[in-house]
Structures are given as structure tokens and as C-alpha cells.
Amino acid sequence: MKKIFGFRSKGPSPLGPSARPRSNCVGFGRESASGSHVPRYHIHDKDMGKIHKAASVGDVAKVQHILILGKSGVNDRDKKDRTALHLACAYGHPEVVTLLVERKCEIDARDSESSTALIKAVQCQEEECAAILLDHGADPNVMDSSGNTALHYAVYSENTSMAAKLLAHNANIEAKNKDDLTPMLLAVKENKQHIVEFLVKKKASIHAVDQLGSNRQMFEYDGKRLQRSENSNPVDNGSEDGSLTRSYNTPGPADSWPTSDEEDYNFDNKNVPKINLTELWTAAQQSRKNQTKCGFEELDNGARFDDSDSPSESEDAIEVEPAPSVRVQTLSPSRQSPDPVEGATELAIEGEENGTDVIESASQEQPNHDNLTRADGWHKSNKSEMMSALGLGEDEDEDSPWDSESISESVSLKDVGHFSGTADQTGKRRAHGQIEDVTYIPSCMSGSRNFKMAKLEESRNVGLPVAHMEAPRKYVIMEPTIERRAPVLNKTETVGMTDAQTFKSEPESVSREEQTRLSGSEDSQQKVEEKRKYKNNEAEPSGNLYSGAADGGADVKPQSGDTENQQSPREGSEGRGSGPALLMKEAKKMENEKWVSREPARTAMSERTGLPTGGWPQMQDGSCWSDTDQSEARPTKKTSSKHNKDSGQTAAVDNLDDFTESSETASEDHELQGPDSESILCAIEHLRLECKDTASLLKIRDAVYSYKRLIELKRSHCELLTGKLKRMENKYKGLQKEMSETEEVKSRLEHEKVGWEQELCRLRFALKQEEEKRRSADQLSEKTMEQLRRKGEQCQSEVEARQQLEASLRTLEMELKTVKSHLNQVLEERNETQRQLSREQNARMLQDGILASHLCKQKEIEMTQKKMTSEVSVSHEKEKDLLHKNQRLQDEVAVLRLEMDTIKSHNQEKEKRYLEDIKIANEKNDNLQRMVKLNMLSSKLDNEKQNKERLETDVESFRSRLASALHDHAEIQTAKRDLEIAFQRARDEWFRVKDKMNFDMSNLRDNNEVLSQQLSKTERKLNSLEIEFHHTKDELREKTLALKHAQRDLSQTQCQMKEVEHMFQDEQGKVSKFMGKQESIEERLAQLQSENTLLRQQLDDAANKAESKDKTIVNIQDQFQDVLTRFQAESQRHSLRLEDRNQELVSECSHLRERLCQYENEKAEREVVVRQLQQELADTLKKQSMSEASLEVSSRYRSNLEEEARDLKKKLGQLRSQLQEARDQHREAVHHAEKMEDHLQKLELEKSKFEITIKKQSEEIDQLQENLSRVNLSEEDKEKLQKLTELKESLECTVDQEQKRSSALEKELMRTIQKKCGKLEKNKKQLEQEVVNLRSHMEKNMVEHSQAQQYAREVEERARQDLVEKLKQVNLFLQAQAASQESLEQLRENSNASVRSQMELRIKDLESQLYRMKAQEDFDKIELEKYKQLYQEEFRARKSLSSKLNKTSEKLEEASSKLLLEEQQNRSLLSTLSTRPVVECPCVGSLHNSLVFNRTLIPRENIVVPTSGLQPSNKRVEIYLTKMHQELEKSINRELKEATAELESEFCRVSPLGSATKASQDQLSDASQEFIDILKKKYMI
């Protein structure tokens, strides 16, 4: 029962071996669920390191301490390849996870099972850890060893929130594991409905396919196709009787086949609908009423449901249990108890545990197109009632997806029976008892919607006979039950593709059977016998058929199992006239005979009717038709008339033996025998002889008809199968084509891969060559960079030394502060102890004073006695001296002595009395003291209670303060962490800067490479130009040769002509020859002279170029020296700025120290006042003082931490500023290096040009020398050649000198660059050392902090012990002097209260005063800053205005002087014009003045001006002068405006500090001088 109603089978888990069931962890794998493996790790101390132990326990502080000390890294692994992150996620420690993630651990690290930390977090259902990992970029699509992702585990654990987070972080919803299961398939397989709906909402693919290719969408598609086929057929209202039970048994969507292979063994009870038996009973009654309304009345023997049947039915159900077959009964509405279901399910479980493949048989019919349902209308009317009673919806009457799929695949025998309303009750019971193997239990009857079906095979051989399959298959076949139980009929595999699958009933035959059975006439029996004979003659080849069709018998379905035989279909009810009493007798006979069979009801009926038991089960063996019978769809004719009754009976017995055979032989045989006709004939003869009942004859007839119908159905089914085979063949061919195409594509890809690999090899070789070139360039650049770094380090070494000194001074000051604070604490504790000692001493002094007073009294008494004795002795002496006087007085002395004795005795008695009185008084005093002590103690108790209450309130307040202090401490720790993170970020920034430097170097290298490429290109161009030059030279030579040849030809012709005319003109020829020679010589001389002039010009050009080159070299040197001087000046300025800044910092530090001293003095004064007050309040506020001391320690610790944090921030700011300065210096050095490289390249280019020109000149000189050697030169020409050679040698010397200078400059540049690089490298190393020192300082501070805490704890413990001891002593002393201190305590309390109130008021006043003072100081500072700004602005405005005024005044003076000069000049010009008649056009002003207007007046011609035209010329001159005045004024105004704008911009750039007044004045004077110089240059003022 447990396995059917929701418990899982012992099948394998759908996911990998890393997952197992656990209380709070998700586990699943390929191994069994009872495995020992757990998703959480098994921890062994030997396997793990320190950080792994701390992470598994969740000790954040320990993990942080280990990481700070560097004992182990963040990504260290243990012996099982687990990181600390794995363990923290597996055991759910989010704080450790955040710490490790912030330390930039490897998030996607894998353990030995190749699972990441995210997978472990999801598997162990640690949502917080998984969220942290996802937020920090963990990959949700990583697979473990079994191919499962984190989403698989989230789906398996039904954790929708985790799945939503994973999908939000781009998890692959279609990821497949090694079993080809997506998360959707896994959810469906594990029957997790909630997560399936969630995945469908998230748009998961419903068309996913697993390893076996099964797909739920196929079932839905086939179900839709079946609905179309059913809707296409018309429905007859007359077929209600046949479809009566189908309304109960139609499976709904929930009864469909499982969607995965795991559901074959998975019996979950998650969605189990509860069955309401009262609703079932009411639905059954309603169905009976509807049946009677439709006109179907049952007979008294079999139609009425009596209560007497229920015990017999239950007995039948109980008798079946020990049988090896599995039978599941449906619930009966008459018996409202699910006992038969439980028994049946137990049997079903036994079959599953034995490994049997359960095949459920269901009686279903396959009618032709013309045979339709009769009770369809009644079924529609009662559909909602029955479904609601069974716990199903209205949709459950629809076809299941499995029905449509199994249509074309079922090849089993099916008998179309007639379900009549007058069915026999015994027949019903017998039909129900003939369920073979396991009947299908729908969700409404079995108690579970998720009752898992049998497994589908790859070929989808659903419903095929066992004989045609190589291995046993699992099928689900549904059956109708015709008892008083709730009838349930499921449509399954045997439903046709286009036919409406209903049970067929024949009301006419039913009515005939009723008439013949009731009347009992022999005529009807004879007719039946004749019909039977006719049938035996016609339908001989039909096998053992199912004769229960009249009672709504079921279809014949082949069953298979490992331990089950192939069973015959369920037979229909036999005799119509049998009553319930006979059925009870038969059941008792079965119990007495202990007849163990799978169909007890059928055997009982066969015994009653005399039918041999082997006659009917023959169909069980022959239920799987042979291949020949299926293909031909016709029976093989066999003669049955030759056999006798005995042979028929023996055949029936043999058939029964075949029926009880094991299914193993049936599953092994591939071809079974077809239906045997002899069994049918024997049954007919047996019925004819022994059972003269019309109902049995009618059953035989109906069986024959149903056999014929089955043959027709098999034909259609075979046609469907052939069509499906053809489709499968076409699919197979298409797949083969696709495979061939894929293979071709693979081959192409491989060829392409080979080609790409070859190209890669080539590219790698080329890259290697390029890398070698780059290495050579990198080495050069590295050398230059090293030199620059060295120079930068030298510059920064001094700065770092100063900073280190400042840091050491700060650390020393901090240490002094901490030591002072500790000393103050120790002094306060000592003062408290001294106060307590002084109090004790005062008490003791009081006691000593009392004792001293008593002793003084006693001493006074003794002194009086001594005086008396001394007086007596004096009197005796006097008596000796004055015997004569004493003799008189001896009597008196004796009397006095007697009196003295009496007095002494009286005194002694008085003393005794006084002592007694004193004792009594002491006793009374003791009693009184006791009473007083009791009163004091009671009052003390009251006071202590009050004090306790006060202290409790104080403790609560202190707790709140402690909580706030702890919160502050936590904030400080977070601030510390933030500082560490900031430090790490600074370090990362430093590394980034380093990377940028490297990147800049790589860019420089690339630039060098580009420049080298450009040089190579220019060299190529030069080579090409040289080649062209050589070609042109060759062409010129060829042309000269051609000219020479032409000249030779001409000379030859001339010679010939001359020889011809030699006879006539000898003399003329000679003269012409001499003349020609002279002309040629002259021409050659002219050519030589022109060439000499050209050479001179070239030499002059070369000399000019050399001079220009010298000038450029000098300019470059000057520029380089200027750059060096600027760099030195900048370094000096930087050093001066640093010194000024250091001085300012020192002054600020001194000022801060003074303020600290003032604060400390104020604190000391306040502490003196507070101590004076605390001395009076010490007795009542001891505990309060302890708590305040602890709070003060925490506050001091907090202040120390804050100061340390500030120092660290300052140091970080300094480091950042240093880094920025180093970057700026590095950039400047790189910029200078680039400039120098550019200059060097330019020099090299000029050098190459000069070399080319020198080569050309040398070549030309050589040519000239050759030409001159040919021609006989004169002495002047020789001298010229010598001069040329000397010039050539001088030029070569100058070129050598220039080369030497350029090499020297290059060396100097390299040296400077190397120095700068060295400085930069030193600065970098010093920065790294500072970082290391800071780290060590942080660690030392941590250690010192821990030591200080330990010391503080020890001091507190000692102080507590001392205080406890002293308190004990004080308590004892107070007990002794309680009475004397009552008044003092009251007075003290009053005084303390008054003093407290006064002190509190005073403290508040002081605090308010301090706050006011601070506010006033802040306000004063703000106002001072405002006034300073205003003053500076006014000062600047005044300066600008004064400068403007001065400039304008100067310019006005200059303009006035100019005007005076111009007026004088004009007067002189007018005087000259008036005197001279011929006037030249005046060039107004000098050439320098013409620069103002950028134009010059060129005198044209001498203009003759008459005397009469003097007045208009004077007017023109005046007009011209006025124009000049206007233009001068305009230009002056422009220059003034520009000067004022420049000055204002310069003043804006000046720093706003008030200390820069002198510098601003200097700048103003410089600017004014520059402006005056400009005006002088432009206007010659």
C-alpha cells in the first residue's frame, strides 16, 4: 500500500552521484537513494587546512586573521580539491562567503566532483550564499561530474526562489545533464507540479526530448487527432446501453501515460484526490434512475443490486490475494470501504517487487463505423455527476494522450461484446473476477492521479502481442467492471484512429434472450441450436472466443509478465437464469476445493454449467494471433466435426494447461498458434448436451459475430501498421541522408581545419620573426626606460626619506599618546587606591583617637596620684628638717594617714563600683549598638535596594552605551576593512599604473616600429630615386654617344667632301678645318666654363647648407640646454614647494601640539575637579566608576583607532599624491625622450641627405676630373680643380665633425635619459618599500593592539581583586562604626546630591559654552575667509586699476609726444612744400612707423606742382595726418585692451593665498615691462 499511495520505488535517481537525500539538502544522483553519500562534505581534520576549518565552522575573524597574516591563500585547496568557499557555501556561512568573495577568490573553482561553490550552495539550499555568489559573477551554467547545473538541483528541491535567481542571472533553462534531462524534464519526471508551472511561465521548452526520445507533446498531438476522429462520427441515441459503463471508466487527462521513464516506478501521493464514497453512492443511484428512465430494466436475477452480494464479492477479493496474479478491483458503491482496492494494490506491489512487467488488461471494444454507442446521450447527461463523485473534473471524460497513440500500435485480439442493462449479476461477478494480471486503476479509484504506467519502449510497441516482442513490455489496459462497484472503463490502446470507440450493444438480442429465458419454450431453444449449428459450420476456424459480450464483456488483451502467463480475455457472464444464491454456493465450493486460479468466478461458473474449464481459456493462448492470420485477416479452416466430445474436453483441458503456463515461454516464442476452431466446437457441443440454456447459445452466436468483427478490425489495424512502417522507413531514409550530409560537412570542416592550421603555423612563424624584431626594439626602449627610472628614483628618494621621517615622527607621537593614556589610567587607578587607603587610615585614626582619649584620662588619674605621693614625700622631708615642728603635727599626720587609708579604700570601692557600672553601661551600649546595627542594616538594606534599582537603571544605560560602543567598534572595524579595501584598491591602482606604464612602453615600441617602417620606406624611396638617377645617367651617356656617332658620321662625310674638293679647294679646306677646330675648342671652353660655374654654385649651396646645419645644431643644443635648465628649475621649484609644504606641516603640527597641550591642561584641571568630587562620591559610586572606567578605556581605544585611521588616510593621500607626481614626472620624461628621439631622427635624416649630396658631388667631381684629363687644360683650370679638391676635403672634414657632434649629442641624450629612468625606478622601489613598511606597521599595530588589550584586561582584573579586598575591609570597618557614620552618610548623600546637580549643571554649562565657542570660532573663520577673499579681490581690482591708469597715462604721454613730433614734421614738410615747386609724394614716417599700417608708400614720379595749387595740397596733408592720428589712437586702444585682458587672466591664475603679494607685484612689473617692450618694438616709442 505504501508504494502505491505515494512512496517512491527503489529506482535510480535521475541526476548524478553527487546528490543524495538529506534533511535540508537536495540530493539526487544515479546511484540509489539510500546511498551513504551526502551533499554536504564529510569533514576530516587531516584533509583540511586552517582556513578550511575556519570557513566550515563560520569563524569570520579567524579567516580574516589567516588571510592578513598570509598563512594560507584564498584559493588554497585541501586534499579533496575543496576551497574555503566550497565549505562555507556547503555549511551556510554567508559572512565567510562575502569575505572570500571580496578578497577576489576564484568563484568558479571545482572540487573533486567538479562541482562549484554555487552548485554546493544550491544543493544544500543555502539561498543567501548562492545569492552572494551570483551577485559577484558566479557562472550558473557550470556542470558537475554528472552534467547537472545549479538549476537542476534547484528544480529537484522545488526551490522556486532559487530557480528564479538563477534564471535572472542568465542560467540556461535548456541545459541537459548526462541523461539528456533538462530542468523541465526533470521536474516532470520527479512529478513536481509547482516547479513545472514555474518553468512553463519562464518559457521553458515543452518539446524537450530525453535519451529514449520520449516526448509528452507526441501524446497531446495524438490525443487531439483522436478527438477529431471521434467528433467526425455521428452519435446514435440508441446505443446508450453499450456505453453505460464507459461514462465511469473514461480516463481523464490525469490518467494518461507518464512523461518520463522514471515514472514507471515512482508512486508519489502528492496529488492524490480523496474519494467521497457518499458521492459515489449518490452518483450510482442517479445512474440507475437515468437507466430506468431510458427504458433499460434489469431482471430480478441479475439486474438488481442486493446487499447480499457484498460479502460474496469481498470473499472473492480476499481469495484472490494468495494467487500469483495481480488483480486490482474497483470500488463498490454498495460497500463503502476501500478494502478490495487495498488488497489488489498489495498484490500489484508484490508483482512489481518481483520484477514483473505489469500489463493491465481492460475490456474495450472496437466497433465498425456503422456501430455507434447507444448510451452516449445518457453518458453526456451523467458525465458531470459521475466525475464530481469520483473526484475528477469534466475534462477527464476526454481521451487520454495514450489512447490515441496506442491506436495504430495495438495488434491484440478484441471481442466486441454487448453491455446490456439486463446483465446477470453472476455474469457481472464472473466478468469482474476474470481480470487478468493487473487492471488499470484510474485516479478516481486507486487513490492517486499519479499512478505510474508501464514504460514505453523505443519502437512504441504498445499493445503488440508478447509473441512478437523480444523482451516483455509494460502495457496499460483498462477494463470495465459490471459489479455493484463504481464502474470504471478506460479507453486505451485499442481505440481506433477514425472510429468512435464505444461498446456495442444489441437491445433486440437482449430482449430475445429475456423472452426465451423467461418462457423456457423449446421452440426458441431449437432455433438457438439451429443457429449454433449454422455458426459451427461457418465459423470453424474461430478460436476460443469471449462469450460474455451480452453482459458488456471486455475486449481480449494479451498480458505479459516475468512470472505471469499469457492470460485469456475476460469472459462474459454465462447463464442468465442463475441467481445470487447459486453464486454464493459456487464461491463456497471454490473455497473448499482450494482451487487457486486467476479467474475464480469464471471457473465457478464453468463448474456450475458443466462447461469444461479448458474450453474458454483456449483464447488466452490464442489471444495473440499468428502473423499469417493478421496479414490475411481470414481464419484458417479446420474441420471440427470429426472430433468427439471427449476430444473437445481434452482439448479444453490442454488449453487450460496452456492458459496456466508461465509467460516466459510466451515471451520467448515469436509465433504462437492461431485460434483453434476445435475449442469452439467442443464448447458448443458441451453446451448443447449439458446446458440447454438459451443465454449460452446466444453468447456463442454473439462470440462468432464478434470474432468476425475482430477480423475486420485487425485488417484495418494491419493497414494502419503498414502505413506507419512506411512512414518510419521514410523517416529512416531521411535520417540516413542527414547523416551523410553531416559526414560530408564534417569532412569539409576537417579539410578547412587543416588549412587553417597551416595558416596558423605560417602566421606563428611570422609572429616569431616580428617578436624577435620587437625584442630588439624592446631592449633598447628598456634601456632608455631604466635610465629614466633611475633618474626618477633619485629625485623621489629624497622626498621619500622626508616622508618616512614624518611618518616615523607621527608614529612616535601616536605611541607617546598611547603611553600617556596608559599612564593616566594607571595613575587614576593608583589615586583611587590611595583614596581608599586614606579613608581606611582616617577610620583607624578615629579609633586611635578614642583609645588615646581613654589613655589620657587614665594618665591624668595616675598623675594626680603621683602628685599626691610627691606631696607626701615633701612633707616628710620637711618633718625631718623641722622635727620640732613635725612632732606637733605627727598626730595630725597619723590622723591624716588614717583618713588617706579610708579615702583609698573608699576610692577602691568606688573604682570597683565604677567598673561594674562601666561593664553594665558597656553591655547596655552593646545591646544598643546591636539594635542600632539592626536598624542600620535594615536601612542599609533599603538603601542597597534603592541603590540596586539605581544601579540596575545605570547598568541598563551602561548596556545601551556599551551597545553603542560596540556598534561604534564594529563601525571602526568596518572602517578598518574599508581602509584595507582602499589600500588594496590603491595597490590595484598602482598595478594598473604599472600596466599603463607597460602599455605606454608597448605603444612607444609600436611607435618605434612604425618609425622604423617609415625609415625603411624612405630608404626604399631613396634607393628608387638613386636607381632612377643612374638610369638617367645611363640615358644621358647613350645620348652623348649617339651624338658622338652622329658627329663622327658628319665628320666622315665632311672629310669625303673635302677629299673630293681637295683638288679644287685645298686651301679653303684647310682654312675651314682650322676654323672648325677653333669653334669646337671655343664651344668646349664655353661648356667647361658653364660647368665650372655650376660647380661653384653647388659648392656655394653646400657651404650654405653646412652653415645652416651648424646653425640648426647650435639651435638644437640651445634648446636642449633650455630644456635641461627648465627641468632643473622645475625640480628646484618642486623641492622648494616641498620644503615650504614641510614647513607648513611642521608649523601645523606645532600648532596642533600646542592645542593638544592646552586641551591636556584643561583636561588635567577638569580631572582635578572631578577627582575632588569623586573622592566624596567614591563609596556610593564604586561600581559605576568601574563601568565608567571600562567605557573610558573603550572610548580611548576608539579614539586611538580613529587617529590611526586618520593617519592611514593621510598616508594614503600622500602616497596617492606621490604616485601622481611620479606619473607626471614619468610623463614629462617620456615626452622629453620622445622629443629627443624626434630631434635625433631629424638629424639622421639631414645627415643622410648630406651624405647623398656629398656622394653626388664627389661623383660629379670625378667625372669632371676624367673629362679634364681627356682635354688639355690650361693652368687656370688646373688651379680651379685644385681649389675644388681642397673645398671637397674641407667639406668632408666638416661632415666628419658634424657626425662627431651628433654622436656626442646622442650619447649625452642617452645619459640624461638613463639618469631620469634610474630616478624613476628608485622612486618606484621606494614606494614599494613604503607599502611594505605600511603593511608591517599595520601588522605591528595589530599585535600591539592585542598586547594592549591583554595588558588592560590584566590591569582590570588586578584592580577588581584589589577593590574586592578593600571593599571587604571597608565593610568590616563600617560594621564596627555604623552608628557614628549614619549622620555622616546622610550629610554626604545630601552633599553628594547637591554637588552632583551642581556638577551636572556646570558640565552642561561648560559643554554649552564649548559648543558656543566652537560655533563662534567656525563663524569667525568663515567670516575671516570671506573678508580675506573680499580683501584679495579688492586688492586685485585696485592693482589692475592702478596698472591700467599708469599704462593709460604712459600711453597718453607717448601719444602726446608722438603728436608733437608729427606736428613738427608736418610743419617742416609744409615749409618745404611751400618753398619747392616740384614735390615728391611724402613717405610718412619712417619704415618702422610703416609697420603700424603694414604698407609702404613708394614714390612714383616727380610731380610738378604749380604755385597756385599749394592750398589744396596742404589740405590733403592735413587730412592724411588726421587719419594717421585716428589710426594710431585706435591701435593704442586695442593694445591697451589686450594688455588689460592678459593681466586679468594672469591675476585669475594666481593662487588665492595672501602670502603671494610680492610674487604678484613682481609679475605685474614683469608684465608692464614686457608690454612697454612690445610697444617700443611696434611703434618705436
From Swiss-Prot:
InterPro entries: Ankyrin_repeat_domain, Ankyrin_rpt, Ankyrin_rpt-contain_sf, CC144C-like_CC_dom, DUF3496. Acts as a regulator of adipogenesis. Involved in the regulation of the feeding behavior. GO terms for biological process: ERK1 and ERK2 cascade; fat cell differentiation; glucose homeostasis; insulin receptor signaling pathway; negative regulation of ERK1 and ERK2 cascade; negative regulation of fat cell differentiation; negative regulation of insulin receptor signaling pathway; negative regulation of multicellular organism growth. Interacts with TRIO. Interacts with GPS2. Interacts with CCDC85B. Interacts with HMMR. The keyword NADP does not apply. The gene is Ankrd26. Transmembrane segments: none annotated. Residues 1-22, 225-270, 299-343, 361-381, 488-652 are annotated as: Disordered. The modification Phosphoserine is found at residues 13, 239, 260, 511. SMART domains: ANK (SM00248). Residues 308-319 have a biased composition (Acidic residues). It is found in: Cytoplasm, Cytosol. This is Ankyrin repeat domain-containing protein 26. Residues 367-381, 505-516, 524-538, 585-601 have a biased composition (Basic and acidic residues). Keywords: ANK repeat, Coiled coil, Cytoplasm, Phosphoprotein, Repeat. Disruption phenotype: Deficient mice display hyperphagia, severe obesity, gigantism, insulin resistance and elevated serum leptin levels potentially linked to defects in primary cilia. It comes from Mus musculus (Mouse). Residues 715-845, 876-1345, 1396-1470, 1521-1550 form a coiled coil. PROSITE patterns: ANK_REP_REGION (PS50297), ANK_REPEAT (PS50088). Residues 229-250, 327-337, 491-504 have a biased composition (Polar residues). ANK repeats lie at residues 46-76, 80-109, 113-142, 146-175, 179-208. Widely expressed. Expressed in the arcuate and ventromedial nuclei within the hypothalamus and in the ependyma and the circumventricular organs (at protein level).
